[in-house]
């Protein structure tokens, strides 16, 4: 077992009841274009077109052969674009249950389907987009083959759903998905889990790896770093446990599986709990009559690295398993730095709340101050479990020194791996965005 001692579990109020409830009826669903790093769409539909579940909506010009398919049948309601015509979302008004059929197998047959057929089925159905590479956190090329594959079968994000509960309600589909994944690599498939009881694969190529401790113990980047680190010439893939279930269901039912169990939680949620819904579901519909106040920020994903769900982005992200809701921190506090802070969380023990570690707090979106220079006072080292020099790396990312950043390990990282650094930073830097800028530059220029 690998125990993560450096890190931080945010004590946020509004933890979800770990019981799965049926979510509300959804009439709109969307694919969010900006989730896919470097993707340049070639549209296959226009507004007003009628589409089936599993039908291609657009393809990636820069990653030939990768298709993005409709998660439901209905009518293309909107194609939203932002600055420089960047694709923000393709919205489908759900109607009917027509679906494109894909090859279907029994659980026994799955063990011998063959890599070529698995890849073709995943690409044709659009399920291929669930896979992500490391380095760069992009959708793999259709002809790529990873050294190994990591299944993230745990979640230590604040307010997250219990992975064990969800997997054990879909045991057969999960093991079917593992049987498919092991045929995609000549190496190992690592199922990274907590101290939980999960269905096991009988294959010697599928290994369970146990992780415990504080966040980021449940992140793919942490698992990859400790088990099979990547480099500029070595690529591994990662996939979330719910997508493993979706792979299994796709191949055994012959239909694209879009169901997802999410956590709807946070201090601004009336009844925090787990909901059964679909990826891409309208967040406005999922949160209707669920919020304590109107002045809130609804986030698709974790409070640490999620996306504000508004306007064209108000849909559940492809890689998100939770919706987090915080009150907006509009109010200014006079001499806030001088108050005891019994209701504020502090990493540096600046407030008296540090004496009560068991207390949870009604976090808001306030940053507690304005942006300023980076202040290296040892905070990053306290919450960074990876074998890197965080202060040096973050400084190089800020100034854009990609050569030094590579030497210090930036290729191993994704935005979520630096989210805690952003949280504890006295200078209020968003390290995820500067990391992405550096990774994009490295990929382009080497």
From Swiss-Prot:
Short name of one Pfam family: NQRA_2nd
DNA damage among keywords: no
Domain of life: Bacteria
GO MF terms, alphabetically ordered: oxidoreductase activity, acting on NAD(P)H, quinone or similar compound as acceptor
E.C. number(s) listed in UniProt: 7.2.1.1
First-tier enzyme category under EC: translocase
Record's keyword terms, sorted: Ion transport, NAD, Sodium, Sodium transport, Translocase, Transport, Ubiquinone
InterPro entries for this protein: NqrA (IPR008703), NQRA_2nd (IPR056148), NqrA_C_domain (IPR022615), NQRA_N (IPR056147)
Catalyzed reactions: a ubiquinone + n Na(+)(in) + NADH + H(+) = a ubiquinol + n Na(+)(out) + NAD(+)
GO BP terms, alphabetized: sodium ion transport
Similarity comment text for this entry: Belongs to the NqrA family.
Subunit relationships: Composed of six subunits; NqrA, NqrB, NqrC, NqrD, NqrE and NqrF.
Function: NQR complex catalyzes the reduction of ubiquinone-1 to ubiquinol by two successive reactions, coupled with the transport of Na(+) ions from the cytoplasm to the periplasm. NqrA to NqrE are probably involved in the second step, the conversion of ubisemiquinone to ubiquinol.
Protein name in UniProt: Na(+)-translocating NADH-quinone reductase subunit A
Species per Swiss-Prot/TrEMBL record: Psychromonas ingrahamii (strain DSM 17664 / CCUG 51855 / 37)
């Amino acid at each position: 077992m690998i125990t993560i001692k450096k890190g931080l579990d945010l004590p946020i109020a509004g933890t979800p009841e770990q019981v799965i409830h049926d979510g509300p009826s959804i009439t709109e669903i969307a694919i969010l274009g900006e989730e896919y790093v470097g993707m340049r769409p070639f549209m296959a539909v226009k507004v007003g077109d009628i589409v089936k579940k599993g039908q291609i909506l657009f393809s990636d010009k820069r990653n030939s052969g990768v298709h993005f398919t409709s998660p439901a049948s209905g009518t293309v309601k909107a194609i939203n674009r932002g600055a420089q015509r960047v694709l923000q979302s393709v919205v489908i008004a759900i109607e009917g249950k027509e679906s494109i059929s894909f090859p279907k197998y029994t659980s026994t047959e799955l063990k011998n389907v063959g890599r070529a057929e698995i890849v073709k089925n995943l690409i044709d159905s659009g399920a291929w987009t669930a896979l992500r590479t490391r380095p760069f956190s992009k959708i793999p090329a259709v002809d790529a083959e990873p050294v190994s594959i990591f299944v993230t079968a745990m979640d230590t994000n604040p307010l997250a759903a219990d992975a064990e509960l969800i997997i054990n309600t879909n045991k057969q589909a999960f093991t079917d998905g593992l049987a498919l994944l092991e045929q995609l690599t000549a190496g190992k498939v690592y199922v990274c889990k907590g101290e939980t009881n999960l269905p096991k694969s009988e294959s010697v190529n599928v290994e369970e790896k146990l992780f415990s401790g504080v966040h980021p113990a449940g992140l793919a980047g942490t698992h990859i770093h400790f088990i099979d680190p990547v480099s500029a010439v070595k690529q591994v893939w990662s996939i979330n446990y719910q997508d493993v279930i979706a792979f299994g269901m796709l191949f055994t039912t012959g239909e694209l599986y879009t169901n997802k169990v999410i956590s709807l939680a946070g201090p601004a949620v009336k009844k925090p709990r787990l909901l059964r819904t679909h990826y891409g579901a309208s967040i406005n519909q999922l949160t209707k009559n669920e919020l304590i106040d109107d002045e809130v920020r609804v986030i698709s994903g974790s409070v640490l690295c999620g996306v504000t769900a508004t306007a064209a982005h108000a849909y559940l992200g492809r890689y998100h398993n939770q919706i987090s809701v915080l009150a907006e921190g509009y109010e200014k506090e006079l001499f806030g730095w001088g108050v005891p802070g019994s209701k504020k969380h502090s990493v540096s023990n600046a407030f008296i709340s540090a004496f009560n570690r068991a207390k949870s707090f009604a976090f808001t979106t306030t940053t507690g101050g304005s942006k300023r220079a980076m202040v290296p006072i040892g905070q990053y080292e306290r919450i960074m479990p990876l074998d890197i020099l965080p202060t040096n790396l973050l400084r190089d990312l800020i100034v854009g020194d990609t050569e030094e950043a590579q030497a210090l390990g930036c290729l191993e990282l994704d935005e979520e791996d630096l989210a805690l650094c952003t949280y504890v930073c006295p200078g209020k830097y968003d390290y995820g965005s500067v990391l992405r800028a550096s990774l994009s530059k490295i990929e382009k220029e080497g």
